[in-house]
Amino acid sequence: MKSPALAGSLATAEVPCTHPDTTARFFRALADPTRLKLLQFILRGERTSAECVEHAGISQPRVSVHLSCLVDCGYVSARRDGKKLRYSVGDPRVADLVMLARCLAADNAAALDCCTRIPGEGEQR
């Protein structure tokens, strides 16, 4: 049974056309498990860099690289609060996108597990 979040379809919606390379790049920004983990954490509320480091369980420089990517790609906003940077998601469609992706991944888990063309976390092609 398909997830309820997939009941509607945007396939016929009127949206601005983007080049396939732009859309692929949009998804590549989320293709890293650490970035996705950080994004899901930030979706639950504004976070500092230190909170993101603790949550991700990796070094501050690595978290900084991932957060910079999320900011540069427009998924996350950063604001300075004294010496701290605080990260948040301003566009509610980002939460919708992540939820849709999770629903699709759950619905297609068996196929994704069998897919040999896209490596899983820690695997190399």
Swiss-Prot record:
- What InterPro entries does the entry give? ArsR-like_HTH, HTH_ArsR_DNA-bd_dom, HTH_MetalResp_TranReg, WH-like_DNA-bd_sf, WH_DNA-bd_sf
SMART domains given for it? HTH_ARSR
Q: Which residues form the HTH arsR-type domain?
A: 15-109
The residues the record assigns to binding Hg(2+) are C69, C73, C114
Keyword field: DNA-binding, Mercuric resistance, Mercury, Metal-binding, Repressor, Transcription, Transcription regulation
UniProt GO molecular function: DNA binding; DNA-binding transcription factor activity; metal ion binding
- What CDD domains is this protein classified in? HTH_ARSR (cd00090)
Which biological process annotations from GO are given for this protein?
response to mercury ion
Q: Which Pfam families match?
A: HTH_5
Leader sequence residues:
none
Keyword Iron attributed: no
| Chain's role | Negatively regulates the mercuric reductase merA and the organolyase merB in the absence of mercuric ions.
**What protein name does the entry list?**
Probable mercury resistance operon repressor
The organism named in the record is: Streptomyces lividans
